[in-house]
Amino acid sequence: MRTKLLIQGCCMALTAITMQSCSGQSRPLNNNGHNLWLGNISVTKSAGKAAWQIECDNVDKKALGADEIGVDASGIYNKALGDEGFSINCIGRHVTVTANTDAARLYAMFYLKRMADCGERIEDKFLVTEIPAFRYRILNHWDNPNLTVERGYAGKSLWKWEELPGKIRPEYEEYARANASIGINGTVLNNVNADARMLSREYLEKVKVLADIFRPYGIKVYLSLNFAAPKHLAGLKTSDPLDKDVIKWWNEKVAEIYGIIPDFGGFLVKANSEGQSGPQDYGRTHADGANMIADALKPFGGIVMWRAFVYAPESPDRAKQAVEEFKPLDSQFRDNVIIQIKNGPVDFQPREPFSPLFGQLENTNVMAEMQITQEYLGHSNHMVYLHPMWKECLDSDTYQNGKGSTVAAETMGKVHGNTSMGAIAGVTNIGDSVNWCGHHLAQANWYAFGRMAWNPDLSSEQILDEWLKQTFTSDRKFVEPVSEMMLASREACVKYEMPLGLHHCFSGAGHYGPGPWDRSSRPDWEPAYYHKAAADGIGFDRTSKTGTDAVSQYHEPLRSLYDNVETCPDNLILWFHHLPWDFKMKSGRTLWNELCYTFEEGIQEARGFIRTWESVEKYVDPYRYGQVHDKLVRQAKDALWWRDALMLYFQQFSKMEIPSDCSQPQHTLDELRSFRLRISNYETPALDKLPEYVLE
């Protein structure tokens, strides 16, 4: 008989340092990760020099193979390059940068720095032109005035509001420099579940300080707004978007903001979702609300990013609701409104099909919202390289205007000819942790988002190769195995958490770990709403004949592909179909065995990550090596925890055995259900507060 669930502790970091001292091998000096991929993140100050000029001095010209770097001083505006594009031309060993603005020159200098730091040399007659794919490349911070970060796993907020405007921390400019190095040009400073105080004069003066710091790096600031701000801040009786006093208040507030921050970017809005106020409170539409804000911003060039993350507890299928609410409003939004759509139709799950809303709006600007923070993928305890997930979404074809109407093309504005409103957003994984992201390898996701926003055609391999070389070493004996490990990590996470299209099977406690049995105050917050495990099978029936007909929100040929169980991809089959436990999969296995073996693959891959990391120990400083090792061990244990919880729970319905050639559960279902993880939505669990597992 098993004893009750144990708790495990970690001491790998100290072990790593001891191992280093006994091995006799020369290893890099300890590195706390604060410098990110920049080598030295500290900002060099030089009186009278623009940021691009300072970065030009930072380029290792010898490593690059250049004698000098100059800038085209003709003063002629190159229309083809626009305000952010640049070209680099090398004649002999002289490099010339052509760009129209200081921001574009800065991007060019970071391009050259990246080349040098990655060991690439510039050759005679080298010529490259770079123009960003998306006009708006924006980070979304879910930071609160009290310094908590919703779904934040890297400490507290980077923004110390209680110190501003008087005290300015060096991290603010370091943050701006890091973002400029990867092409980010905007940041939303506060949580979409917005505190109305962020629009008060007191806080606007604080925001101004950050805007002034970010401006030389080509970064504009944006704010999330509370739709009920007129009531909260001005004491109006209503926030009805068609009320003349409400309209007047917003016009005056926006004018006030631009008087303080002349290049303010605009607003991000979460309305009528998860308890947030919105225009529907007054019988108005999303378009009514968005347009009121857009009209106030229009004279100043600002934009509204209106989130499509809406769902109601009474709906039989949460995945359908964004299309149901927004498609009828197509063509009704102002031209400076962008509908911000999560990559999938539910909520940042390890794997979802792309949101069908991307292909349903023909005369409305749309943008993608990716989640860089790992809300459902192990927080900052798990190593999961997310670019393959995002690229899977962007490369997906909506078929809205026939073949080639990819999510990337839709959100860049190419499908409907409005590239001036192309936009993409990423919910950050940044906090005041010394390494910024809570996990040293999670920095790759911040880096990858920026590089993808600049050029979505870049491969996951290329971006990761760049990041590893700049952050650790360019030695191929390190880069190749670690790259292989990280490239496999997203698929491994899907396998050990929610394979074959399963989704929303997590614990409600901070969204960490499994909880397929969890109950909640709303049915659409309960895992059973999604997995629908029962004696007759498992999976959500979204087919046209027997289900919710969510497949009809996709254009052909996707509608038929997903609707037919014979053609539906295995990796989404339980997203679209409810199948019997003995259903024969394409592999020839029963569905039950396919689940068992897929979980097992994820478990073994997570264990393999530990071995890979141990094999490159000599290339990594002891500090980062030890911290990453601790977390990889926990990740492998969590993989077992996920498998045990889901398969033992589902076994109640299937009445089938876990195959003998799979690793067997280490805990009973009762033990797992009795475990209580007590964390908030603003933290990741400590490694010593999680279920004990033995790695064989």
What spans do the regions from the language model cover?
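Bacterial N-terminal signal peptides
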Residues: 9-18
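Bacterial Sec-dependent signal peptides at the C-terminal "C-region" and cleavage site
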Residues: 17-27
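Short, well-ordered secondary-structure micro-motifs within conserved domains or adaptor modules
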Residues: 52-83, 95-98
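Catalytic-core regions of glycoside hydrolase
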Residues: 163, 201, 235-465, 475
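Bacterial N-terminal signal peptides that target proteins for export
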Residues: 1-10
